[in-house]
């Protein structure tokens, strides 16, 4: 499976405006775009002129799925551009403590990694969306097979953190949960732009394209 040249899942995009919304979009979505908040790329089949995006609000239930014209993109922030950032508001939250603790072991892997989810949104926008019970969502780019022993060691490292860590391995087949791969399951769920796949090896191209 070839890597997409344009925006990829978990990228944050700037440039979407209320004018790009359908008439039935919720008022809070329009307000978020007026405020200049980024939108996040979601998984969906490729479209030549648009990218599937999600808009988030301050409330947990405020999530909206839509489409953004590719021509409207003014800036693209990938998850790995956020890993070394500090939040604009220095709040002593478990997720931020975990991020600081994990930078060294993640950097030591020699692979690109970054922050996604609410933490990534807050790092990119400066809007405080995390709370004391928030998870820390991470992405690790693994274009080549990631040894299960390494995955298990990383998972054990996460268990020492003050909050739940949800790391996704970005493989040729799509996103795979680190926990599933580390636990040695015979097949793991790979989330790609099309339907999710249960695969023995998400790095084996023949299996991915079958």
UniProtKB/Swiss-Prot annotation:
<dbReference type="InterPro" id="IPR049180">
    <property type="entry name" value="MdcG_C"/>
</dbReference>
<comment type="function">
    <text>Transfers 2'-(5-triphosphoribosyl)-3'-dephosphocoenzyme-A to the apo-[acyl-carrier-protein] of the malonate decarboxylase to yield holo-[acyl-carrier-protein].</text>
</comment>
<comment type="similarity">
    <text>Belongs to the MdcG family.</text>
</comment>
<feature type="active site">
    <location>
        <position position="135"/>
    </location>
</feature>
<dbReference type="InterPro" id="IPR017557">
    <property type="entry name" value="Holo-ACP_synthase"/>
</dbReference>
<dbReference type="Pfam" id="PF20866">
    <property type="entry name" value="MdcG_N"/>
</dbReference>
<dbReference type="GO" id="GO:0016779">
    <property type="term" value="F:nucleotidyltransferase activity"/>
</dbReference>
<protein>
    <recommendedName>
        <fullName>Phosphoribosyl-dephospho-CoA transferase</fullName>
        <ecNumber>2.7.7.66</ecNumber>
    </recommendedName>
</protein>
<dbReference type="Pfam" id="PF10620">
    <property type="entry name" value="MdcG"/>
</dbReference>
<keyword id="KW-0808">Transferase</keyword>
<dbReference type="InterPro" id="IPR048903">
    <property type="entry name" value="MdcG_N"/>
</dbReference>
<feature type="active site">
    <location>
        <position position="137"/>
    </location>
</feature>
<keyword id="KW-0548">Nucleotidyltransferase</keyword>
